[in-house]
């Protein structure tokens, strides 16, 4: 069976105990009301009344603000002291509870900067519940003075940025940044550097390819020119050899002609 203590999130800072009593009127006897800045706790005598209040009043308007109503975390044994002005840390849940119920991780992540070192993840989660349902919270890990908060919906994340950015927690004004935007900016810068390096390598490869092509073309042209010039001396050699081969024949013919002439002269005498 659920507990008797109910958490109120997104509570208007101007809300008073009378407003809270009027809001929960008709849901059973209230044992205690503990209001903080932006959130609060209501304790019923009967846990069934607390169940009904969570089921029917979650998302309703209280002092012109839609509040979130959910069961509060179990308090430690040492924090049972009652009273309307109880210590602000009495509503913390013990660390063992975190192990038993693992948090739900979502993509609706919010980065909290300039976080005081005195603020724990429990304090941060309770503070951020003013904006919506918080599924996960962590502080000072891995970076000091920085926290991470994840919401159940993107609308709660935007609501937190609009309402809680610049607010003070333990004397420090926090700065809220959407986690996806930070990741996108880093990925864009990395992609730009990668694209520039890739374009440089591509231009270099293109230059080397064009240079190799020009060199291969020049080599092919020189080879073609040398090939076209080489037959010329062969023709000249053929011409020279033919002229040389014809010269003995002409000598023989001249000799035969001279012999025939000499014979004709002798026969005439």
From Swiss-Prot:
Give positions of region: Disordered: 73-105, 174-269
* Family per similarity comment: Belongs to the splicing factor SR family.
Q: How is it modified after translation?
A: Extensively phosphorylated on serine residues in the RS domain.
* UniProt domain RRM: residue ranges: 4-74, 108-181
Induction line = By insulin and hepatectomy.
Instruction: Name the encoding gene, please.
Output: Srsf5
What keywords are assigned to this protein?
Acetylation, mRNA processing, mRNA splicing, Nucleus, Phosphoprotein, Repeat, RNA-binding, Transcription, Transcription regulation
List residues modified as Phosphoserine: 86, 224, 226, 230, 247, 250
The UniProt entry's GO CC annotations, sorted and at most eight, read: cytosol; nuclear speck; nucleolus
> Per the UniProt entry, what is one GO biological process?
positive regulation of RNA splicing
SMART domains documented for this protein: RRM
Q: Which organism is it from?
A: Rattus norvegicus (Rat)
A Pfam family of the record is: RRM_1
Question: In this chain, where does the modification N6-acetyllysine occur?
Answer: 167
Q: For this UniProt entry, which residues form the secretion signal?
A: none
Q: Where is the composition biased (Basic residues)?
A: 74-83, 181-226
- Cross-referenced InterPro entries, in alphabetical order? Nucleotide-bd_a/b_plait_sf, RBD_domain_sf, RRM_dom, RRT5_SRSF_SR
Q: How does it assemble?
A: Found in a pre-mRNA splicing complex with SRSF4/SFRS4, SRSF5/SFRS5, SNRNP70, SNRPA1, SRRM1 and SRRM2. Interacts (via RS domain) with PHF5A (via N-terminus).
| Name of this chain's protein | Serine/arginine-rich splicing factor 5
Q: What does this protein do?
A: May be required for progression through G1 and entry into S phase of cell growth. May play a regulatory role in pre-mRNA splicing. Autoregulates its own expression. Plays a role in constitutive splicing and can modulate the selection of alternative splice sites. Could play an important role in development and differentiation in the spleen and thymus.
- Subcellular location as annotated: Nucleus
Please note every region of biased composition (Low complexity).
239-251
Query: Which is an annotated GO molecular function term of this record?
Result: protein kinase B binding
Q: In which tissues is it expressed?
A: Highly expressed in spleen and thymus.
């Amino acid at each position: 069976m659920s507990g008797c203590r109910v958490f109120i999130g997104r509570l208007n800072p101007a809300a008073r105990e009378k407003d809270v009593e009027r809001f929960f009127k008709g849901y059973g006897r209230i044992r205690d009301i503990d209001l903080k800045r932006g959130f609060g706790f209501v304790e019923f005598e009967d846990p069934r009344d607390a169940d009904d209040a969570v089921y029917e009043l979650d998302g309703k308007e209280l002092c012109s603000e839609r509040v979130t109503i959910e069961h509060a975390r179990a308090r430690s044994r040492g924090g049972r002291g009652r009273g309307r002005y109880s210590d602000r840390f009495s509503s913390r849940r013990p660390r063992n509870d975190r192990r038993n119920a693992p948090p739900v991780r979502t993509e609706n992540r919010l980065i909290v900067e300039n976080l005081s070192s005195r603020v724990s993840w429990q304090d941060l989660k309770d503070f951020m519940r003013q904006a919506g349902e918080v599924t996960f919270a962590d502080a000072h890990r891995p970076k000091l003075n920085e926290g991470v908060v994840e919401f159940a919906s993107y609308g709660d994340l935007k609501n937190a940025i609009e309402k809680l950015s610049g607010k003070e927690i333990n004397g420090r004004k926090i700065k809220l940044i959407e986690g996806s935007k930070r990741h996108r900016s880093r990925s864009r810068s990395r992609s730009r550097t990668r694209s520039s390096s890739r374009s440089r390598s591509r231009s270099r490869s293109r230059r080397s390819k064009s240079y190799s092509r020009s060199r291969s073309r020049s080599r092919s042209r020189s080879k073609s020119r040398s090939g076209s010039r080489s037959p010329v001396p062969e023709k000249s050699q053929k011409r020279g050899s033919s002229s040389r081969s014809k010269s003995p024949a002409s000598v023989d013919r001249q000799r035969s002609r001279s012999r025939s002439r000499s014979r004709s002269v002798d026969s005439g005498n």
